[in-house]
Amino acid sequence: MLAGTVFTLASGCTDMTIEGLARDTPTFDFREYFQGHTRASGWFSDRFGKPRRHFCGDFFGTEKNGKLELDETLFYSDDVTESRLWLVDLQSEGKFSATSDSLIGDATGTFSGNALAMIYTMRVKIAEDKEWVLGMKDFMLLQPDHSLHNITQVYKWGIRIGTVSTQYTRHDGSQMCREVITRQSGGFSRALDTEKAA
């Protein structure tokens, strides 16, 4: 979920489970974490583990009728921009579901301790005029410093074809990913270099 998009990738990762990843602390409260502005950055790796497509993203969460509405915009290194709106319903007994305009069916998942796992099928923009339908498995882990890390296993025609690595950090909306990119001459790559040097 949430910056978990990819294309023409391959991964050698072994299958993960929430039981194998979860720890008791810190407790990951998805609704609380994604309230307000959250920024994401990450990359897609090919079958040899080489990064092929970088991205950054802005997320804005608002609680509505007990659910979290999450507005996501991703900016890719090939100048493709992708937006979607999520509605996340955190249920009892460690389960949740989510809907989005990009999903085929609903996303479903579980959460425990500092971890969350989710599976879904999504239409992903791989170019401005082309989409693929991909299966996704997300594994999110909240770290002691309250940064959030996500590994997404990606499937096409039932075969795992890639992995996405994403890190989320809370922000106050004063510096959005979109603004960092657009104010830097030279575009996305220049903006990434500037962010790393800061």
Segments from the language model and where they lie:
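Surface-exposed interaction patches
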Residues: 108, 116-139, 145-152
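Bacterial Sec signal peptide processing site at the extreme N-terminus
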Residues: 7-27
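Amphipathic hydrophobic-ligand
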Residues: 51-57, 131-136, 160-162
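Glycine-rich, aromatic-bearing surface loops/beta-hairpins
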Residues: 137-198
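Post-signal peptide N-terminal segment of mature Sec-exported envelope proteins
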Residues: 22-41
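N-terminal export leaders
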Residues: 1-2
